[in-house]
């Protein structure tokens, strides 16, 4: 009932806003089909449903980039959906032409006050459209607000919210319901005893502790140039249960780890959610501290913040506004990075489509993504530019070579034969090999 109510309110709003039954039916059918296809593919790739924040990819002009992520195994599904939409549009348009009732509610904008019928019709037309949008908005916001009347009604009718686990919520309540419930985002619940006095007390406490820890230290981190590299979907495969190789897949990294300071990171996501890990690495803020409805800070939080904090600002404070630079060998608007990195204070974000684009954009064999070696060269160029400067800097790199979907891109892939893992599905083996 909860899922039906959400879809019914959307359909009703379309009918009353357009005042055309068949046009609204066409828009609703096409939108629902596109939503279903996109949701299915995203679940397949990321084990996540479509959320409202994903619409920023479309509004930001990233539709083409998103389509490049569609796996070949889903292409037939996409083609079938396109054929369905074409036939559905033809049928809906034909019915619109054949049906003599062009308007759902009688109104006349050309002669609004010609007679009582037109006056009443126009008033009712406007009120119905506004009321339908208000009802839909109230329903959507109520689903995401515990304690609201809508929330209580939904709970009484089988709604089982799991906003901390979007895929679980979608499976339990329907993807459309999950989408609507996330339309209102509350970044964080207000902690008990939260006040300016409390925060100043905490700041003083940890400043004193930091002073004690650093008492015997002569240098500062900002005395050095720091490069933060977030390697797309990188991990040590030999640590994954059930995965085995006849040769070491990361000998160079393992050698570096054995000869210098190194360690392990507990990641909140594996094989996806890169932007969330990136946000947490840059800010030090754990997503566990936020409200369950905040799923992607880069899309839902940072663009709306006035002065968000990030670690690169420590270098900016000491060396000026040009002390931090970022590199991402893909489109700048993906996850709104162009907006977010500007908010963080980075002097420039070099991407494939930035005003000053990246020079090193080579790919390996048939891979569609810029190789890691090319991305590293972009960072080395920034270091070379700094040689004559007495200032240190913070450099941020987010790579793309290992981004999904995975394909048979590489001619000399020794890991395909070296994979001696057992009890793997065909899909798992393919992902590991490629």
What are these regions (language model features)?
Residues 214-217, 231, 236-434:
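Solvent-exposed soluble domains appended to multi-pass membrane proteins
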Residues 1-165:
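Transmembrane and membrane-interface helices of multi-pass
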Residues 72, 209-213, 247:
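N-terminal post-signal-peptidase region of extra-cytosolic proteins
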Residues 46, 55-64, 177-187, 192, ...:
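Short alpha-helical interface patches
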Residues 141-228:
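Membrane-interface segments at or immediately adjacent to transmembrane helices
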Residues 55-58, 172-179, 196, 250, ...:
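Alpha-helix initiation and N-capping motif
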């Amino acid at each position: 009932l909860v899922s039906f109510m959400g879809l019914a309110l959307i359909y009703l709003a379309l009918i009353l806003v357009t005042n055309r039954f068949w046009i609204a039916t066409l828009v609703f059918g096409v939108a629902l089909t596109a939503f279903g296809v996109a949701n299915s593919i995203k679940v397949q790739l990321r084990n996540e449903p479509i959320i409202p924040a994903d619409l920023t990819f479309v509004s930001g002009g990233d539709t083409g980039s998103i389509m490049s992520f569609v796996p070949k195994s889903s292409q037939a599904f996409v083609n079938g959906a396109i054929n369905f939409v074409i036939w559905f549009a033809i049928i809906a348009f034909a019915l619109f032409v054949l049906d003599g009732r062009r308007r759902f509610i009688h109104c006349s904008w050309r002669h609004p006050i010609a007679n009582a019928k037109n006056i009443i019709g126009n008033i009712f037309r406007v009120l119905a459209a506004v009321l339908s949008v208000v009802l839909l908005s109230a329903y959507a916001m109520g689903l995401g607000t515990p304690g609201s009347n809508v929330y209580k009604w939904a709970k009484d009718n089988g709604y089982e919210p799991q906003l901390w686990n979007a895929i679980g919520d979608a499976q339990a309540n329907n993807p459309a319901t999950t989408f609507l419930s996330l339309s209102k985002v509350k970044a964080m619940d207000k902690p008990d005893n939260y006040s300016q006095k409390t925060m100043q007390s905490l700041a003083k406490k940890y400043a004193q502790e930091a002073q004690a820890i650093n008492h015997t230290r002569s240098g500062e981190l900002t005395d050095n140039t720091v490069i933060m590299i977030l390697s797309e979907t990188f991990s040590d495969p030999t640590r994954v249960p059930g995965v085995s190789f006849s040769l070491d897949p990361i000998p160079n990294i393992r050698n570096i780890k054995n000869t210098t300071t190194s360690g392990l990171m507990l990641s909140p996501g594996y094989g996806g959610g890169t932007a969330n890990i990136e946000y947490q690495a840059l800010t030090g803020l754990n997503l566990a501290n936020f409200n369950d409805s905040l799923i992607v800070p880069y899309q839902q939080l940072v663009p709306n913040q006035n002065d968000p904090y990030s670690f690169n600002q420590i270098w900016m404070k000491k060396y000026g506004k040009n002390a931090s630079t970022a590199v991402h060998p893909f489109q700048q608007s993906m996850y709104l990075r162009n907006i977010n990195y500007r908010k963080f204070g980075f002097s420039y974000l070099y991407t494939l489509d930035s005003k000053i684009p990246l020079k090193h954009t080579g790919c390996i064999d048939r891979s569609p993504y810029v190789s890691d070696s090319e991305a590293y060269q972009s960072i080395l160029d920034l270091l070379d530019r700094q040689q004559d400067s007495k200032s240190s800097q913070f450099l941020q790199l987010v790579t793309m070579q290992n981004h999904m979907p995975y394909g048979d891109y590489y001619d000399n892939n020794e890991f395909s034969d070296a994979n001696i893992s057992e009890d793997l599905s065909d899909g798992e083996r393919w992902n590991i090999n490629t």
